[in-house]
Amino acid sequence: VKRADELIPWKVTDISLRPFKQMWSMNPSIHFDGKTWRCVLRCTDYAMPGGVTVRSDRARPGQSQTKNAMVIFDPASWKPIEIYKMRERDDLPRAAVGSIGFEDVRLFRTDREGLQGIAASLHLKRSHRGKQLVEQVVLSLNDNYDIIKARPIRGGWSNSPQKNWAPFDNCAEARFLYAIDKGTLFDARGALRGADTIVRPSTRGRQPYVPDDHVRERAVERANDSEEARERAARKRRDSDHSHHAVVTEPQGSWYEGLRGGTQLVRAGQDAWLGIGHAMTFVDKLKYYWHVWYLVNARGALMSASYPMKLAPNGIEFAVGMAIDGDRVVVSFGVDDMESRIGETSLAAVLATLRSIQRSVA
């Protein structure tokens, strides 16, 4: 799988912080509302350097804990301006489980309820009997970014664990994409059908930046002109680093099948929402992740996708946030469950990597 910097402009900044003692920060979710750059950091009492789990001195046996912090960043330097510890002040009962806290929060905004989050949770007690399962929870925040309301998304579909739903950002009301290649849309109450199966853009939001044809053409030309050089450089790097890097064959055929939600979906055209999903395999008994950029339309149908790429050269990688400001695309991702990073690129360059999805009609 190729590195991101072989395919697109790719500048990476380490934004790792430790808002809580003896806890690592990971899986950051960046969000931009046109004025403020916010980012939720997931902070945990364990980490996975090199795919091997280590635990902090504060970790309790048989238990892992997640706390969250909201960071306001200066987008020029990516230095923190303000840090808020997000306290859990919702009134839902907790269960005695091994995983505590709201995990991998994705930030999004709607006209109806403002800034919200969607997270995975195992620690909320279910009212009915049965096994505790990971489920998605919609979070409401106050002005200090405390979690003041948590609404589990439950129903007939939740007999199996549910994680990594992709929220549509800056839309009229909450919409979530699950099963990217199938285009399954949900709201906060459950699966959508009929006329409700659509994402309506915010009536208050900014107009999306759409690169003109000249910008798109230049990006495509740069990608095509440098392909051979990139291949040569990639082979040289792969040969020289063979003892330190896993060699994974790039997925063939329908490379986009089985993608799982990573970042929010951000509007990138009149009927186009851009996101990044991930896939994973095992290499030498260790997890190996890669990412794919993709576009869906307002009904959640997959229209195009990039070929797989690695956001980080090595380690577990997990993208949870994305924001677009003009032609600037900012991606936030975690590495080895112990680092938080920002990757910056160009919208025109990203769109130039996308390939149309042609589906057969039965």
Roles of regions detected by a PLM:
Residues 1-362:
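Beta-propeller domains
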